[in-house]
């Protein structure tokens, strides 16, 4: 969000600050209004009409100005902090560089001084050893003088070291001088106490200790004065001289040892300073001063302290000095000569120990430097290697972490996947085998069911013989004697059997020979027959329990392609119980039938088509579905050259309607309208002109004759009328007219007819009763 003056902040932060600013401003304004109201109520002044508002500047402008000023102040503070941090970093770096340079310079100088001191001390040692045999006082004084000079030189070197360490940088000069002065004061105080304790030994020893204290407290320019004082001192007694020598040697050893330790500490602290960028030379010096102070507090400590390690040469030298001391003590030498030899021997041993300690410290320092540099190089190489590995192995590390976090779940998931694959393969194989077995089982079951249904149906199908009947099972078929057909037991009541068959099978004979599947025969009686439906009912009596009543199905639910079985007796008794298999080839077929064999079709039979094998003798046989239920009765087949397996069966629902009336009445009552008709398709051109038939009319019937007082006459139908539609159905010919009229045999309701009379179209209602 741009608020001006080159300040850009996020929109959410801008809205939050604006909301807080408005809230605070409204609260302040409400408080002011409340306070002004109290003042007005108390003073009852005329200031009640005073407008209590802030300036006319818009709230948003005030908020933007306030926010921009706040951001400017914050930026200034940030810049100042950055400047101070950069300055402090530069100062620390410069101070560190100076201290580091001074530390290196001091260490180099100290190494050179140590080497020079070792050479001088060795030469002096050999000279003093050669001069130790002398027993004169002059040589003893010379040796004592040289010893004092050596101690003064050591003190000078110590003061020079302290002086060099005290001026590493101008930045820390004042603080370091203060710390040194405080430490020297503490050292001087400790030395003063020691002097007071030893005051009983004589004025010479006290004067000498005060001079030593003054040497430690004085600065570098006063070293020459201390040397003069030492040279001008009076000779000391033997106990005082031994005590002084021992104290000086201890101080020198302590300085050398602490300096070596401080050098190692400086190196270790220098490594830490590289990571923190903070100089640490002053701290190392403080540690050195503290160690010196602690050691000086115990002047009586022996040289053989646990912190100092003696070499084999030192031990041999000590033993030699001890033997010489005993020898000199037992000798009849003077007290001065014994004193000088003993002081010389102790001085030599002290120098030897100092040399060995310095060598040991230098060796430790070199080892420490080598280890430090090696560690630094190793750290650098390790850091580079780690960076390279981190860059190259970042992805592998992520994968390892992911695996370590989720490996149980991943293992379980992999196991589940493998198990699913295995089970899938197993189940696929099993399912394949099951499907094969199911197919085989289905085929076996289908075959078993077919066989079962066939066996059950055979028990319900009988042979019907009529010697006087004529063959009329097919259109234009020649008449023959000794007709044999089939029948179906559709009902059984006790020993009474009701058999349905075709009307053309029973013919004109009332009695029929009924033969069962077990070759037993009985005589049956025809209860009724209907030539228009080609159905007849025969009643027979038999106590044979093998004869079964067939189960009735529903022909309204037939499906095209549905498998069926046909059971009958083709060609007579010799082939009784023949079973053929097929499917339903067609539904709602209108098959023309010639019952009286006059080469003229008499009726349209409503049937369904099957492709099962049907032969003479199958008429009246049973058509069952795969459940073994009766769905039709075989009625006819087309017997023409080049035509095969085209047979027809009457639906069982139509059969039930007919046999019910035949069983009770013996006949079927159809409505008769009392007319005779001709088909339009058979008219010639003169006949079409006579009835004034429009040219567009191609199908229908022409009324040729109307019976007086008949249903047609009562309905107003006249000769010459052309009927093209009946009961809402297209009328093709006179067979279709009879089929539509006979379909209303049960309700006998009036039906509508569309006719042409004198070339004009009109509708009339035809009565059926």
UniProtKB/Swiss-Prot annotation:
Residues 21-64, 71-108, 138-186, 264-296, 310-330, 348-364 have a biased composition (Basic and acidic residues). One of its GO terms (biological process) is proteolysis. CDD domains: cpPDZ_BsHtra-like (cd06781). Its EC number is 3.4.21.-. Its main location: membrane. It is a single-pass membrane protein. One of its GO terms (molecular function) is serine-type endopeptidase activity. The active site is at residues 504, 534, 619. The chain crosses the membrane at residues 410-430. Residues 1-390 are annotated as: Disordered. It holds the Pfam family Trypsin_2. It is found in: Cell membrane. The keyword Transmembrane helix applies. Keywords: Cell membrane, Hydrolase, Membrane, Protease, Serine protease, Transmembrane, Transmembrane helix. Gene3D superfamilies: 2.30.42.10, Trypsin-like serine proteases (2.40.10.10). SUPFAM superfamilies: PDZ domain-like (SSF50156), Trypsin-like serine proteases (SSF50494). Residues 1-20 have a biased composition (Basic residues). Residues 680-733 form the PDZ domain. This is Serine protease HtrA-like. It comes from Staphylococcus aureus (strain COL).
């Amino acid at each position: 969000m741009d608020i001006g003056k080159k300040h850009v902040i996020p929109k959410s932060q801008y809205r939050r600050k604006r909301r807080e600013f408005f809230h605070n401003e409204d609260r302040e304004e409400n408080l002011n209004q409340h306070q002004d109201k109290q003042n007005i109520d108390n003073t009852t002044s005329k200031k009640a009409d005073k407008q209590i508002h802030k300036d006319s500047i818009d709230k948003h402008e005030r908020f933007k100005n306030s926010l921009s000023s706040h951001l400017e102040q914050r930026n200034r503070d940030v810049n100042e902090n950055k400047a101070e941090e950069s300055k402090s970093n530069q100062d620390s770096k410069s101070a560190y560089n100076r201290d580091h340079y001074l530390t290196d310079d001091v260490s180099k100088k100290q190494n050179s001084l140590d080497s020079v001191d070792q050479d001088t001390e060795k030469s002096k040692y050999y000279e003093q050893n050669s001069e130790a045999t002398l027993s004169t006082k002059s040589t003893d004084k010379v040796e004592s003088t040289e010893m004092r000079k050596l101690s003064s030189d050591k003190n000078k070197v110590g003061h020079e070291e302290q002086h060099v360490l005290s001026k590493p940088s101008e930045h820390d000069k004042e603080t370091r001088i203060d710390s040194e002065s405080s430490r020297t004061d503490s050292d001087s105080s400790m030395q003063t106490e020691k002097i007071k304790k030893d005051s009983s030994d004589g004025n010479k020893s006290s004067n000498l200790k005060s001079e030593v204290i003054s040497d430690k407290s004085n600065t570098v320019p006063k070293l020459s004065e201390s040397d003069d004082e030492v040279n001008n001192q009076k000779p000391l007694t033997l106990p005082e001289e031994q005590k002084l020598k021992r104290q000086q040697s201890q101080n020198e050893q302590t300085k050398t040892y602490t300096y070596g330790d401080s050098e190692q500490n400086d190196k270790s602290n220098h490594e830490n300073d590289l990571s923190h960028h903070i100089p640490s030379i002053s701290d190392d010096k403080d540690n050195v001063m503290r160690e010196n102070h602690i050691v000086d507090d115990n002047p009586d400590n022996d040289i053989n302290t646990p912190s100092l390690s003696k070499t084999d040469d030192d031990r041999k030298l000590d033993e030699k000095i001890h033997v010489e001391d005993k020898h000199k003590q037992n000798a009849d030498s003077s007290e001065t000569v014994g004193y000088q030899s003993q002081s010389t021997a102790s001085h030599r041993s002290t120098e030897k120990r100092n040399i060995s300690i310095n060598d040991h410290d230098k060796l430790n320092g070199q080892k420490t430097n080598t280890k430090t540099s090696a560690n630094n190089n190793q750290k650098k190489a390790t850091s580079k290697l780690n960076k390279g590995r981190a860059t190259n192995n970042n992805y592998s590390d992520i994968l390892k972490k992911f695996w370590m976090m989720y490996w149980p779940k991943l293992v379980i998931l992999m196991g589940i996947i493998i198990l699913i694959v295995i089970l899938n393969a197993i189940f696929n194989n099993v399912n394949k085998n099951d499907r094969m077995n199911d197919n085989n089982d289905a085929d076996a079951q289908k075959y078993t069911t077919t066989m079962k249904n066939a066996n059950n149906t055979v028990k319900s199908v009988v042979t019907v013989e009529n010697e006087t009947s004529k063959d009329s099972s097919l259109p234009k078929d020649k008449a023959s004697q000794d007709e044999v057909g089939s029948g179906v037991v559709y009902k059984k009541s006790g020993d009474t059997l009701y058999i349905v068959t075709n009307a053309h099978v029973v013919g004109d004979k009332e009695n029929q020979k009924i033969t069962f599947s077990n070759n037993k025969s009985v005589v049956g009686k025809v209860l009724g027959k209907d030539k228009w439906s080609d159905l007849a009912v025969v009643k027979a009596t038999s106590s044979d329990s093998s004869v079964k009543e067939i189960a009735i199905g529903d022909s309204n639910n037939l499906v095209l392609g549905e498998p069926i079985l046909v059971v009958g007796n083709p060609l007579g008794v010799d082939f009784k119980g023949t079973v053929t298999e097929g499917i339903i080839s067609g539904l709602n077929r209108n098959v023309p039938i010639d019952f009286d064999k006059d080469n003229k079709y008499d009726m349209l039979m409503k049937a369904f088509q099957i492709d099962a094998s049907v032969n003479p003798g199958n008429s009246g046989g049973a058509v069952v579905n795969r459940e073994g239920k009766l769905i039709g009765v075989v009625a006819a087949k087309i017997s023409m050259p080049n035509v095969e397996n085209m047979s027809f069966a009457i639906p069982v629902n139509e059969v039930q309607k007919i046999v019910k009336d035949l069983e009770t009445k013996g006949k079927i009552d159809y409505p008769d309208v009392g007319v005779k008709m001709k088909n339009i398709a058979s008219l010639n051109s003169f006949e079409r002109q006579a009835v004034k038939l429009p040219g567009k009319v191609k199908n229908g019937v022409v009324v040729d004759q109307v019976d007086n007082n008949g249903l047609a006459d009562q309905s107003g139908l006249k000769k010459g009328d052309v009927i093209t539609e009946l009961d809402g159905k297209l009328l093709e010919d006179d067979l279709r007219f009879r089929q539509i009229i006979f379909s209303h045999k049960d309700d006998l309701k009036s039906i509508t007819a569309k006719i042409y009379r004198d070339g004009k179209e009109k509708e009339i209602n035809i009565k059926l009763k």
